């Protein structure tokens, strides 16, 4: 029979189908299995309106037959089959979909969920096959026909022998090249894995005659090979089962089987939404942190299914970065896929699903916080930093979403507390939410700057994570209460500020002299009423704090960003009498004391001093 040319487009179009639309060769099997499932669906829907067509679900299946000797891979279905006209129209015309036409014809009926809608998935098989043979026996025909093609050269159609209804696709697998190993598509183990990966939830059994080994009868140590049909897919997704049928252990097993994590999840969340866009989500909050979570190598995203067929392993658009720790999947019939079924069109359906998922995750986290505090603390120790990054990123666009989820260590409660809990305990005369940043809890406890706030009986939040202060500066306030660092020049204590101003006026010349000695290292030297037992400390003179300076200094291209500092002197400390005496009688000694006290303040903050040798010499002079 003469070779026919493809009706639509040209050699270039077919090349595009094979080489450009699909980015992953292995998805050809997903496409052919989805087509086979569609064919069985069509037979079922026809049986609903045609009493001459029988349909017993247990008799319908998809069979996979690899043959290494002949280098063929065969996919057989027991579906509706194709007539000669349908072979011509559906396979002879690129991008013509029989499934789409059938769906349009039946769209008034409920329950139609045909997967294939574009008519190009079939051609993905040319990525791994030199030749494709399709034998099909239509339910509407007494004769069977064969469609055969080697790709761009065109195709042939002729009658053939095939008694059973349905379609048989025979792929002649390409020979290996230096760059490509096509043998893998003939290996039973690999085929089984591909079906588990992409087509595990096709609702009809996918069978393959598998080679197995058993103990030879009558022997103790001799084994023999045998072949047995094995169903490779589980068919019914766990998220489509009745909730009453699924136990917590089932979700936990699914979580581990899918390699979402190696331990039981902290929380399993199942959500079914119907409306403008309908979908089912099965989400998991991990109980442990992935080893690469806080690295660039970590890839966020949920598995995305269309009618139970995996179309994307990591759909990043479904999760905001601050919830990137969430694992799981989404299955929807309403997705607008592009013609390769590999990629999504970025439309409002996807955005709406993502918005709903974000709200669901927040709701579940708040529920855990309220009802299972210990579980939330465990979660927060693993992923709290990510939530705080979320507050800081995008110029604070998500701060209102996350502000009730973040926690900090409390000076009075000696544990992690929420901002809401802090505000609920604020004293009547307290204006601000006070916080103290530092390297760790133990060091923050000893900071001189916290003394006056403690004496007032005010609770202090400890910021021991590098992102904490950046997040709070973006948050700015909570329930109309501003945040105030214990390093701030103004702590909001009016009585102490008046006394402080008096001390500054009385000792103005001393402080100006010390500032000049330090030669630009500080913006100001002044009296301090925040100090009780310590002689000296540093305070912030600008929005860039001392702790932020440390963080920024470790970043690439930091441009040597420095915090503007204030050196504060405790005028009630004995050291200040020595300072005043030196100012009056020994200016050289005061120069040494100024440098010494400044370096002491730097060491308290964990900042490097410029000249350690000179500092050591000054200490020795003071001892003498």
From Swiss-Prot:
Belongs to the heat shock protein 90 family. Keywords: ATP-binding, Chaperone, Cytoplasm, Nucleotide-binding, Stress response. Molecular chaperone. Has ATPase activity. Residues 1-341 are annotated as: A. One of its GO terms (molecular function) is ATP-dependent protein folding chaperone. It is found in: Cytoplasm. This is Chaperone protein HtpG. Residues 342-550 are annotated as: B. SUPFAM superfamilies: ATPase domain of HSP90 chaperone/DNA topoisomerase II/histidine kinase (SSF55874), HSP90 C-terminal domain (SSF110942), Ribosomal protein S5 domain 2-like (SSF54211). Homodimer. HAMAP family: HSP90. The keyword ATP-binding applies. Residues 551-624 are annotated as: C. It comes from Clostridium tetani (strain Massachusetts / E88). GO terms for cellular component: cytoplasm. It comes from the Bacteria. PROSITE patterns: HSP90. The keyword Nucleotide-binding applies.
């Amino acid at each position: 029979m003469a070779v026919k040319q493809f009706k639509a487009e040209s050699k270039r179009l077919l090349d595009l189908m094979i080489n450009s639309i699909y980015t992953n060769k292995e998805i050809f099997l997903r496409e052919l299995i989805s087509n086979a499932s569609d064919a069985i669906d069509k037979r079922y829907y026809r049986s609903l309106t045609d009493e001459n067509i029988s349909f017993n679900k247990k008799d319908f299946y998809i069979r996979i037959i690899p043959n290494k000797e002949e280098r063929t891979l065969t996919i057989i279905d027991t579906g509706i089959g194709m007539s000669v006209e349908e072979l011509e129209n559906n396979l002879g015309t690129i991008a013509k979909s029989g499934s789409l036409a059938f769906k349009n014809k039946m769209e008034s009926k409920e329950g139609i969920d045909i997967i294939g809608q574009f008519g190009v998935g079939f051609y993905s098989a040319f990525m791994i096959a030199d030749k494709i043979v399709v034998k099909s026996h239509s339910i509407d025909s007494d004769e069977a026909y064969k469609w055969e093609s080697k790709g761009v050269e065109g195709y042939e159609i002729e009658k053939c022998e095939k008694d059973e209804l349905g379609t048989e696709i025979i792929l002649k697998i390409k020979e290996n090249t230096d760059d490509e190993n096509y043998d893998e598509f003939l290996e039973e183990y690999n085929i089984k894995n591909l079906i588990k990966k992409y087509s595990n939830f096709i609702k009809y059994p996918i069978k393959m005659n598998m080679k197995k080994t058993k103990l030879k009868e009558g022997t103790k140590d001799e084994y023999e090979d045998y072949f047995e049909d094995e169903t490779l897919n589980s068919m019914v997704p766990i998220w489509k089962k009745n909730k009453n049928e699924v136990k917590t252990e089932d979700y936990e097993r699914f979580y581990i089987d899918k390699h979402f994590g190696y331990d039981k999840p902290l929380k399993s969340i199942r959500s079914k939404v119907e409306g403008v866009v309908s979908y089912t989500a099965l989400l998991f909050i991990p109980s442990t942190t992935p080893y690469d979570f806080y690295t660039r190598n970590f890839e966020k995203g949920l598995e995305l299914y269309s009618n139970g067929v995996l179309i994307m392993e990591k759909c990043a658009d479904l999760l905001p970065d601050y919830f990137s720790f969430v694992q799981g999947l989404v299955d929807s019939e309403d997705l607008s896929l592009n013609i390769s079924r590999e990629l999504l069109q970025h439309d409002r359906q996807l955005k709406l699903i993502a918005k709903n998922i974000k709200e669901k995750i927040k709701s579940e986290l708040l529920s855990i916080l309220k009802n299972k505090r210990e579980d939330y603390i465990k979660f927060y120790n693993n992923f709290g930093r990510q939530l705080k990054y979320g507050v800081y990123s995008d110029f604070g666009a998500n701060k209102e979403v996350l502000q009730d989820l973040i926690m900090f260590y409390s000076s009075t409660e000696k544990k992690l507390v929420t901002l809401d809990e802090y505000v609920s305990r604020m004293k009547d005369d307290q204006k601000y939410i006070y916080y103290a940043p530092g390297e760790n809890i133990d060091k923050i406890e000893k900071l001189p700057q916290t003394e006056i706030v403690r004496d007032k009986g005010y609770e202090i939040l400890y910021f021991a994570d590098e992102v904490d202060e950046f997040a709070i500066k973006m948050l700015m306030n909570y329930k109309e209460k501003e945040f105030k660092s214990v390093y701030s020049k103004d702590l909001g204590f009016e009585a102490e500020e008046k006394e402080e101003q008096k001390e500054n006026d009385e000792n103005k010349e001393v402080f100006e002299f010390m500032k000049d000695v330090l030669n630009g290292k500080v913006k100001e030297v002044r009296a301090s009423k925040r100090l009780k037992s310590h002689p000296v400390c540093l305070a912030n003179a600008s929005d860039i704090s001392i702790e932020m300076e440390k963080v920024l200094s470790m970043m690439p291209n930091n441009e040597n960003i420095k915090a503007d500092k204030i050196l504060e002197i405790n005028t009630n400390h004995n050291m200040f009498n020595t300072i005043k005496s030196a100012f009056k009688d020994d200016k050289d000694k005061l120069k040494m004391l100024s440098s010494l006290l400044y370096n002491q303040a730097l060491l308290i903050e964990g900042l490097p001093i410029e000249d350690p040798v000179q500092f050591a010499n000054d200490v020795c002079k003071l001892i003498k």
